[in-house]
Amino acid sequence: MGWTRNFSNPKGFIGKVFLASMNATHTPISKWALKKYDWKTDTAALDIGCGGGMNIKRMLKLSPHGIAAGVDVSEESVKKSMQVNRKHLGTRCFIKHGSADNIPFESECFDVVTAFETIYFWGDLQKSFNEIFRVLKNDGTFMAVCELSDSKSPWGKMVENIRIYTPEQLSQYMSDAGFTDIKVLKNKSGRMCVCAKKKAVI
């Protein structure tokens, strides 16, 4: 396995190093994006591709009486996320091994679903977005957060199995999954957060 595969599926010692690095390097974009959601005291959140677990930890602080769950394809990531959030495991925090296209949670149980720096590596993006739509409650929010949105970025050739999506592409996938009120938010550094709502069917 090429070492860049650890971007999508951290394993072994190198994977542990990657997870520690991600917790640090993803902090600016994570804090910026989390401010875009109106957190309640009892918000139920799911972070897909939870990596090192720092965003779950932040969500638990933002919603002191809510829950924060995580899913990751990497067993190393699941272990790290559990370690970082061990204080609330089994009570307010639930972390499972799984993928975005087959989310191991029941339908309509989350107020917000986030995906930080991870959709580049999802095999079937449409199926994954359909799954996110399924687990969201009515009026729930999906937030896809990316630093990369230019298909010509050199990262596209440097990292194994990466696919970089434009805001327009992500918006279309979301629309096809049934999402509405799709908004593309960008900051001065070019970081992107594509937000969408699951509206109740009347």
Model feature map: region roles:
Residues 139-146:
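Conserved beta-strand signature within the Rossmann-like core of class I S-adenosyl-L-methionine
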Residues 101-112:
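A short acidic, Gly/Pro-enriched loop at the edge of an enzyme's catalytic core
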Residues 180, 186-202:
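Core SAM-dependent methyltransferase catalytic element
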Residues 112-124:
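A short SAM/SAH-binding and catalytic strip from SAM-dependent methyltransferases
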Residues 126-138:
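A short glycine-rich, Lys/Arg-flanked "PGG" loop and its adjoining helix->strand segment in the class I
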Residues 162-177:
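Short alpha-helix
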Residues 24-43, 58:
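Conserved alpha-helix/loop element of class I SAM-dependent methyltransferases that forms part
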